[in-house]
């Protein structure tokens, strides 16, 4: 009986996901930063998209390179078929342990978290009924909170009491995704 319930559950979930899309950002994944996403249709023009990207490495050039970014996004498609041009608004967050730009010639690295708020634009092109390609870019404000460490001693180098803080306007999203429409 348990087997039948498990099979029913799997079949029911596949049927329930029939209007949904799974995304793999081919561009970042090939560079060693796997990015997976999920999108579900809300109405004729709106969808909810969420993706996560992370580092497949512990380090690069003997420097720390670990991060995970999760970004939920609301997308608006002017056409009612959820293909073609779209715009999106998103809020995201990340955790990281890496060496920031400008510290390449030192033993210093930064560890912390940030949040991001911004917009994306993109285009979805269906290759077949079930497979599509998506090109997109996005950016906005990035507000970071981190502590600086010396990799040789493990001691903090920055002198900040709690966290260093920085805020920038940056392009931080983009790529070419392969989409599987279920």
Indicate where each model-derived feature is located.
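Residues that define the transmembrane beta-barrel architecture of outer-membrane proteins
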Residues: 20, 30-32, 64-70, 83, ...
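Sec-dependent N-terminal signal peptides
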Residues: 4-14
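Membrane-embedded beta-strands of outer-membrane beta-barrel proteins
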Residues: 36, 72, 119-121, 174-178
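Membrane-embedded beta-strand positions of outer-membrane beta-barrel proteins
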Residues: 24-26, 50-52, 72, 87-91, ...
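Transmembrane beta-strands of outer-membrane beta-barrel pores
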Residues: 28-30, 52-58, 76, 91-97, ...
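Outer-membrane beta-barrel "beta-signal"
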Residues: 76-77, 168-182
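Flexible, solvent-exposed loop segments that connect beta-strands
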Residues: 54-64, 93-114, 144-167
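Repeated loop/turn-to-beta-strand initiation elements of outer-membrane beta-barrel proteins
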Residues: 45-48, 82-83, 129-133
């Amino acid at each position: 009986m348990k087997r039948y319930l498990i099979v029913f559950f799997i079949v029911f979930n596949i049927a329930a996901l029939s209007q949904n899309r799974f995304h793999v950002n081919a561009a970042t994944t090939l560079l060693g930063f796997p990015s997976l996403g999920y999108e579900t249709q809300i109405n004729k023009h709106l969808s909810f998209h969420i993706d996560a990207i992370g580092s497949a490495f512990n380090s690069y050039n003997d420097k720390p390179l670990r991060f995970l970014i999760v970004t939920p996004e609301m997308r608006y498609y002017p056409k009612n078929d959820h293909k073609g041009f779209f715009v999106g608004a998103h809020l995201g967050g990340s955790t990281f342990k890496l060496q920031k730009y400008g510290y390449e010639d030192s033993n210093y690295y930064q560890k912390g978290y940030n949040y991001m708020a911004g917009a994306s634009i993109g285009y979805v092109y269906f290759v077949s009924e079930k497979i599509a390609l998506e090109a997109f870019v996005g950016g906005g404000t990035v507000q970071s909170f981190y502590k600086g460490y010396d990799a040789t001693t493990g001691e903090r180098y920055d002198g900040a009491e709690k966290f260093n803080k920085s805020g920038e306007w940056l392009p931080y999203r983009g790529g070419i995704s392969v989409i599987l429409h279920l």
